[in-house]
């Protein structure tokens, strides 16, 4: 076994690509390392094409092995299970830029498996996984129009940072991943602290420039280790059939795409396609129906694109920079802590916000370490939202990805734990969909958070942009429909405030998207975003002063850290009794901070009173109402505070001489006692005599 290795410096890390030793039965395999973070990438493609398939079956599986971090999995079975949210997100991140680099018409099944086998907690595996995937596909015998370069870009103190580590990202105002070929950007995924458009665009350009070193290294590896590519050519197009279909359907498609309503338009398109197919079958019973369907789809795309390029109104009659009609409502559900209904054209999101305690926060144990997520955003896309039937169950990859994008858009404006000590869960239910439901979720989330009284820094809105480009002519579209997303050349989602961008996601299907085009798209998106924010402000322009009556109110108090054990009690008995008897949730921190949560104000007051009792210090000279707990020959022990007993000596029970303690006191009897002394060992000396009011002195005789 003779390994072929290429190494290069990338930012502050050394990247190594190695092939020829591991997984030699795959079409290609690369062991890719960035520092101590190492991934094994394998690529396998089926030689035989499934003739009946009308799509490209590419599967990307990204898996993190706990042994990579020197851990044993939790749970009963002690092995890795279903993919985590992070694994799903990284699989999507890898899939998006490589998919358009396979040739049109290629329908052989391809599977890419990325396995994290070693991890440095300071180096995230996502970028090296993408680099390794690009290298494996490039040296494989599969048709692939790569290589693909990848870069992570940070922004600190006004400077871009190439491939920042985890600690540097924590201080950065930007976390941007950009992927592209030598001449074109294909994919951008980012989260930002409300940065201006020019800074975001500069980050994309900077990342694309820096990633050329990756492309050059992969080209060198391919020259040395690359396999001969498959002898694959795209199937020849039947020009006669193309012309027949054009004659049968072009005019009808042009008319159908002037229907504004989505369902009417869809029905019209289906009807005209069925009519065209019937006519072709009548002429030739052996016509390839799959080919006909594909050509009708190509014609449909051409008709819509040519109308947009020629300056005709869009599918629903709008101009390129117009946003669909907006309908915005906050506080639409009576018992939720916060809610909103955001409608933009035929896209609608019902969004709810739920407040919880720190105990409700999501605790994540990943190979990068353990962390707590206080803000959660979940996105659901039920089949009825597009007028279809389908399976309902656990979230799919797309739902997880859209939820994370919306989370990135909002996270920058969320308050800190010190400002707002609640865990927050937002759920976006997409009740209607015709384009850009993830950005509707951003808008709805901003509204629901404010309705719940969450003190977010400012409102956030999102917009999806599209692009149609033919030669040197192009049109940038604001607020794209589902059909425009499918038929266009770019999907460009931007979320942000009036001051800047908080999240940017871009997927480009063609080469030739210049910096100028992206700049125009960002400026057009800014105008649309401000328009949406103005409409949102009419529903609610700032967070409510108080949280919902149905939400748990968190009251914070400080106790002596040495008293924490008293509040917890033996085996947790005291705090368990407190929570059960008052109906509150109580959380203790090591510094003595106590958080009491309850929707019932009286319950909170009772919990505070009892905690103050438990943690109170015994004060000399203070009179307490106590309870006799034990009687001995020389006196009685009396509880004056929870967990605090003192001794009333027999001589301190009454003014007269006491011969038998039991003649004066019984266990369970309540008595007033005065603290006379607390010695160095914490023992408390009490007196019943001194707790009694003194008789007034008799007046002097005249």
Curated annotation (Swiss-Prot):
<feature type="domain" description="S1 motif">
    <location>
        <begin position="621"/>
        <end position="689"/>
    </location>
</feature>
<keyword id="KW-0548">Nucleotidyltransferase</keyword>
<dbReference type="InterPro" id="IPR020568">
    <property type="entry name" value="Ribosomal_Su5_D2-typ_SF"/>
</dbReference>
<keyword id="KW-0460">Magnesium</keyword>
<keyword id="KW-0694">RNA-binding</keyword>
<dbReference type="InterPro" id="IPR015848">
    <property type="entry name" value="PNPase_PH_RNA-bd_bac/org-type"/>
</dbReference>
<dbReference type="Pfam" id="PF03725">
    <property type="entry name" value="RNase_PH_C"/>
</dbReference>
<dbReference type="InterPro" id="IPR004087">
    <property type="entry name" value="KH_dom"/>
</dbReference>
<dbReference type="GO" id="GO:0006396">
    <property type="term" value="P:RNA processing"/>
</dbReference>
<dbReference type="InterPro" id="IPR012340">
    <property type="entry name" value="NA-bd_OB-fold"/>
</dbReference>
<protein>
    <recommendedName>
        <fullName>Polyribonucleotide nucleotidyltransferase</fullName>
        <ecNumber>2.7.7.8</ecNumber>
    </recommendedName>
</protein>
<dbReference type="Pfam" id="PF00575">
    <property type="entry name" value="S1"/>
</dbReference>
<dbReference type="GO" id="GO:0000175">
    <property type="term" value="F:3'-5'-RNA exonuclease activity"/>
</dbReference>
<dbReference type="InterPro" id="IPR015847">
    <property type="entry name" value="ExoRNase_PH_dom2"/>
</dbReference>
<dbReference type="GO" id="GO:0005829">
    <property type="term" value="C:cytosol"/>
</dbReference>
<dbReference type="InterPro" id="IPR036456">
    <property type="entry name" value="PNPase_PH_RNA-bd_sf"/>
</dbReference>
<comment type="similarity">
    <text>Belongs to the polyribonucleotide nucleotidyltransferase family.</text>
</comment>
<feature type="domain" description="KH">
    <location>
        <begin position="552"/>
        <end position="611"/>
    </location>
</feature>
<comment type="function">
    <text>Involved in mRNA degradation. Catalyzes the phosphorolysis of single-stranded polyribonucleotides processively in the 3'- to 5'-direction.</text>
</comment>
<keyword id="KW-0479">Metal-binding</keyword>
<dbReference type="InterPro" id="IPR027408">
    <property type="entry name" value="PNPase/RNase_PH_dom_sf"/>
</dbReference>
<feature type="binding site">
    <location>
        <position position="491"/>
    </location>
    <ligand>
        <name>Mg(2+)</name>
    </ligand>
</feature>
<keyword id="KW-0963">Cytoplasm</keyword>
<keyword id="KW-0808">Transferase</keyword>
<comment type="subunit">
    <text>Component of the RNA degradosome, which is a multiprotein complex involved in RNA processing and mRNA degradation.</text>
</comment>
<dbReference type="Pfam" id="PF00013">
    <property type="entry name" value="KH_1"/>
</dbReference>
<dbReference type="GO" id="GO:0004654">
    <property type="term" value="F:polyribonucleotide nucleotidyltransferase activity"/>
</dbReference>
<dbReference type="InterPro" id="IPR003029">
    <property type="entry name" value="S1_domain"/>
</dbReference>
<dbReference type="Pfam" id="PF03726">
    <property type="entry name" value="PNPase"/>
</dbReference>
<dbReference type="InterPro" id="IPR036612">
    <property type="entry name" value="KH_dom_type_1_sf"/>
</dbReference>
<dbReference type="GO" id="GO:0006402">
    <property type="term" value="P:mRNA catabolic process"/>
</dbReference>
<dbReference type="InterPro" id="IPR036345">
    <property type="entry name" value="ExoRNase_PH_dom2_sf"/>
</dbReference>
<feature type="binding site">
    <location>
        <position position="485"/>
    </location>
    <ligand>
        <name>Mg(2+)</name>
    </ligand>
</feature>
<dbReference type="InterPro" id="IPR012162">
    <property type="entry name" value="PNPase"/>
</dbReference>
<dbReference type="GO" id="GO:0003723">
    <property type="term" value="F:RNA binding"/>
</dbReference>
<dbReference type="GO" id="GO:0000287">
    <property type="term" value="F:magnesium ion binding"/>
</dbReference>
<dbReference type="InterPro" id="IPR004088">
    <property type="entry name" value="KH_dom_type_1"/>
</dbReference>
<dbReference type="Pfam" id="PF01138">
    <property type="entry name" value="RNase_PH"/>
</dbReference>
<dbReference type="InterPro" id="IPR001247">
    <property type="entry name" value="ExoRNase_PH_dom1"/>
</dbReference>
